[in-house]
C-alpha cells in the first residue's frame, strides 16, 4: 500500500518517528479496535484513534447524546443532542479522518453478545 500525498502529510509526525515509521503507520491503517461506550472515556479515545489513522474502529453504545454529556464527551456537539451516540461519534470521526472506517453497534454490551461484537469487527 502506497501512501497518498495527503496521507504522508496527515501522518508525517508518526512516520518520522523511528518507533513508528512507514511500517508502523501501515499497521495502524490496517488495525482494528473495538470501543465499548462513546461516553466520557470512549469519546476522546475514539477521536485519538481516528486521528492516528486506525483503519477500522467499532463503537458500541446504546445511549443517546444528552445535553449533560457535552462538557465531558467531546466527540458530541450541541446539534447531536437526541442523536444516537454511535451515530454522532461516527460522523465526527469520519469528518476528522476519511481514512477511517467506523462500524457502529447501537446496543448494550452483555456477556451474551460480547464475542459476537468482537468477531464481527475481526471478520470485516
Please provide the spans of the model-predicted regions.
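Adenine nucleotide-associated cytosolic modules
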Residues: 1-122
Amino acid at each position: 500500500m502506497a501512501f497518498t500525498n495527503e496521507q504522508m502529510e496527515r501522518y508525517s509526525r508518526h512516520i518520522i518517528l523511528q518507533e513508528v515509521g512507514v511500517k508502523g503507520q501501515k499497521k495502524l491503517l490496517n488495525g482494528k479496535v473495538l470501543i465499548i461506550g462513546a461516553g466520557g472515556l470512549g469519546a476522546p479515545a475514539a477521536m485519538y484513534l481516528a486521528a492516528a489513522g486506525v483503519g477500522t474502529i467499532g463503537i458500541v453504545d446504546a445511549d443517546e447524546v444528552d445535553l449533560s454529556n457535552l462538557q465531558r464527551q467531546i466527540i458530541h456537539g450541541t446539534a447531536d443532542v437526541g442523536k444516537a451516540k454511535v451515530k454522532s461519534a461516527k460522523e465526527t470521526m469520519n469528518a476528522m479522518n476519511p481514512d477511517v472506517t467506523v462500524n457502529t453497534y447501537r446496543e448494550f454490551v452483555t456477556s451474551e453478545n460480547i464475542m459476537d461484537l468482537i468477531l464481527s469487527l475481526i471478520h470485516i
